[in-house]
Amino acid sequence: MRKQIVADNIHGETGLDGPVFESLTRQAESTHAVKYIIDTLMASDGDITLVPVGPLSNIAVAMRMQPAILPKIREIVLMGGAYGTGNFTPSAEFNIFADPEAARVVFTSGVPLVMIGLDLTNQTVCTPDVIARMERAGGPAGELFSDIMNFTLKTQFENYGLAGGPVHDATCIGYLINPDGIKTQEMYVEVDVNSGPCYGRTVCDELGVLGKPANTKVGITIDTDWFWGLVEECVRGYIKTH
């Protein structure tokens, strides 16, 4: 394991800067994440979908420690990678670059994969108009969305000169709710773990020139009207249940 890489230039020192949260009342779980993944999957009937929205270190270690979990995973829908430009290096997206070797383990595991990468998530650009829409939806969820995304828009402008910021992780949940809202294409995807400018790149064989069987459904486009409608529905739904 190498030294942890963080994106505090985008998400702040806490990883979730912007909102002001109340003091924590829940303690951290005593069980290690890798053991929890293994135990949970081994006790399942193969009906669990994993949705990692960060580096794949824990899942990769679990796969290596207990290969018997592989047939227990119905699917992995992950936020990470790109078939175009990266966002942490010119070649690599942050979640994959943070642990390319772990990503390689996952992408070669044989488990059904859906890669929701930057090419798709960058289509969900959150603008001040979107923030205002969620504020109008009201309640603590609308306020939380506003606090997080106003901070994100600030850092996106400071770092990249962009007037808006994408909402990456929620697209994975959107895919689970309605796969038809996201167009995917089956491709062979390989993670570059060679030292150099392409380290951490998800090499996507879009045209099939390598002749290797596809191992990943890669997100191509998203119905943004549907997506923002879903986000607003969730914001309003929180008000009704709390």
From Swiss-Prot:
Keywords: Glycosidase, Hydrolase. One of its GO terms (molecular function) is purine nucleosidase activity. CDD domains: nuc_hydro_IU_UC_XIUA (cd02651). Substrate binds at Q156, H168. Pfam families: IU_nuc_hydro. Belongs to the IUNH family. RihB subfamily. The keyword Hydrolase applies. This is Putative pyrimidine-specific ribonucleoside hydrolase RihB. It catalyses: a pyrimidine ribonucleoside + H2O = a pyrimidine nucleobase + D-ribose. PANTHER family: INOSINE-URIDINE PREFERRING NUCLEOSIDE HYDROLASE, URIDINE NUCLEOSIDASE. It comes from the Bacteria. One of its GO terms (biological process) is purine nucleoside catabolic process. Its EC number is 3.2.2.8. One of its GO terms (cellular component) is cytosol. The keyword Hydrolase applies.
